[in-house]
Structures are given as structure tokens and as C-alpha cells.
Amino acid sequence: MSSTRAKIAVDAMGGDYAPDEIVAGAIRAVEELNVEVFLVGDPVRIQKYLDEHSSPANQFLHVVEAEGVVEMCEEPLVAIRRKPKASINLSMQLVRKKQADAVVSAGHSGAAMAAALLKLGRIKGIDRPAIGAVFPTLDPERSVIVLDVGANVDSRPKYLEQFALMGTIYSKYVLGNKEPQVGLLNIGEEPSKGNELALKTHELLSSNPAIPFKGNAEGRDVLSGEFDVVVCDGFTGNILLKFAESVGAVLLQILKEELPRGLRGKLGAAVLTPNLKRIKQRIDHAEHGGALLFGVAGVCIISHGSSKAPSIFNAIRLAKEAIDNQVIQRIQNYTEEHQALLEQQTNSTTTLSEVASSAMIEKSE
């Protein structure tokens, strides 16, 4: 792991609880992680919170003035062009100027993606960005990354092939899986199952020697621990993401309601408290912080709009892990080495407008 203090630009005005919860998460990050944070947003509101929550680590917090924020009701591409000094734009600009190493935002996800494409650009050889989310599995020592979970409503086989390549790199170097197993989300295990997208993608993944493709993954397989990377289109992935999060929330609520019933239940709950905390750490989305935007030439973590301090802390941790493990550089190196093959597979040019028009820009509630 790198000993260099990573520099993270945080969109302090993005999210339902900005800026207080965003700043609180950043304070914890500079206290516990080897990071330096640029808080981009309204300097008066940010500084007010910092003054009320003094910490020796605050020397590693810097306030960057921004003007405005992209609201959830705004069309992302129009808004980021109309608001050049919005917090998400200036956050991306810090990375572009190499004053920061990564961006974390709990604001408008479509705006974050559009700003990343405009300011940072795509990695050469990658046609579409993808949002990758990490899920727990039945194996406590193993996680699975699913992508795309919301960057693109529609997709093409070659996009999913690229997602598989990027996911494999992340799984290997960040999640620590020496031999990642890649699965294609589908309605059956057999290669003949699925729609046209699934069938053609299966052919590409099977024939690419750089992808350790295990086969189709059914919905029940995603969290089984059998796969380390699962690829799908953003429409399907976003539904999977929100369903999985709701199941985790329901399970935690049921445990809270059922365990304390009666004296025996209260005693049992007291004994099980450490176990319950570990369960929460594994299934609560706040513990994961956010999702990496793959395919852009910079580290960008997209967090929930409902993120509070713990989520922001974990999002900054995710950003630092991506920086320390050189995820972007490794993807760039791979695409450069295999550029001829990638260009041969590319039949059309993807424009920013095409990406923005297909992006899923709703806020995760």
C-alpha cells in the first residue's frame, strides 16, 4: 500500500444531508486514513461545521469555494455546462489539474458521470463507462463486484466485455482475488439461455483469453461466492442493486424487532450484539460507501444520495484503495496493450451525448 497521502476531492454539496454529513465523513477520513481532502462547496456552511467540530486532523482538510450544485430535477449534461462552477464540476477539475487524485460525490449521479466524461475523458479503448458496486457474499472473506449497476440503460455485447475486463482488474488488485471468476448475469446457466444481448456477450466472453469467464450467473448465484465479477446491462444491474439493498435493510430491521422480545430474547440479543454488528458491516450499503465509475480517466466514487457520514468515510476509503492499487493505470495499460483488438471490435464511435442520454440519472433513495 502506498505511504503517500492520497488527495481526495469531495463534492460537499452533493446529497440529501450535505454539507454537514459530508464534512463529518471527511473529518473521520483524515483522522483514520492517510488522506488529504478538498471539500468543494459553500465555504460559509462548510467552515461553520469545521469550526464546530475542531480536530487536529483538520489541517488536512481544505475548503474550495464553489457556486451552486446540480439539482436532482436538472438534466445532467445541460446543468454541468450551464453551471461551470458547480461543486461537482470543480471537484472533477481538481483531478484534471492533478491537484487531487480522486472525486467522491453523493450528488446527482448522472451529473457526476457527465462531468467525469467532460473533465477527465474516457480511457482509450473503453466505449462506455460503467458503475461497479461491491456486494458481500456467503464467504466472509470474499466480495463480488457487479457492473454495470446504473451508468447505461441499454448496452451492447462489446460494452459488457469491456466491463468484464475492468471488473477483473479491480477484483484482482483491490479485492485481492488472485484468480477472479467472471459471470454473465442471465436467466439460466446454459450458454443457450437468455436474450440476444446475453447470447452474443456469452460468445465474446468465452472467446476472450484475457477474461477468466466461468459462465452464466443466475440471480441466486450473485452472492453465492462462486463469482468474483458479474456483468450485466445498467438497467438490470440497477434493479439488482436496489433489491439487494432493500433485502439487507429488511433483514436488519427484522433482527432488531424480533431478537429483544421477552427476557430470554433480551439476554440473547445482548450476547449476540457483537455478531449483529458484524452482520450489519457485511450487508449494510452504508458500510460499502459507494461505487466506482469505471472507464473514465480518473478515480470517481459515486455514493448514495442518502449518504451520511459513515458512507462518505467509506467512499473516501474506496477512493484511496483504487488510488493505492493503481486501478485506472492498470486499465489504461491493458487497453493500450490490446488496442488493436479493441479497435477491431469497435464498430461505432460513442459520443458524450449518447452516454448522457442513456445514463440512469435517478438518485438512489
From Swiss-Prot:
The keyword Cytoplasm applies. GO terms for biological process: fatty acid biosynthetic process; phospholipid biosynthetic process. Transmembrane segments: none annotated. It comes from Picosynechococcus sp. (strain ATCC 27264 / PCC 7002 / PR-6). GO terms for molecular function: phosphate:acyl-[acyl carrier protein] acyltransferase activity. This is Phosphate acyltransferase. Gene3D superfamilies: Isopropylmalate Dehydrogenase. Keywords: Cytoplasm, Lipid biosynthesis, Lipid metabolism, Phospholipid biosynthesis, Phospholipid metabolism, Transferase. Pathway: Lipid metabolism; phospholipid metabolism. Its EC number is 2.3.1.274. One of its GO terms (cellular component) is cytoplasm. Catalyzes the reversible formation of acyl-phosphate (acyl-PO(4)) from acyl-[acyl-carrier-protein] (acyl-ACP). This enzyme utilizes acyl-ACP as fatty acyl donor, but not acyl-CoA. It is an enzyme of class 2 (transferase). HAMAP family: PlsX (MF_00019). Belongs to the PlsX family. InterPro entries: FA_synthesis (IPR003664), Phospholipid_synth_PlsX-like (IPR012281). NCBIfam families: plsX. PANTHER family: FATTY ACID/PHOSPHOLIPID SYNTHESIS PROTEIN PLSX, PHOSPHATE ACYLTRANSFERASE. It is found in: Cytoplasm. The keyword Transferase applies. Homodimer. Probably interacts with PlsY. It catalyses: a fatty acyl-[ACP] + phosphate = an acyl phosphate + holo-[ACP].
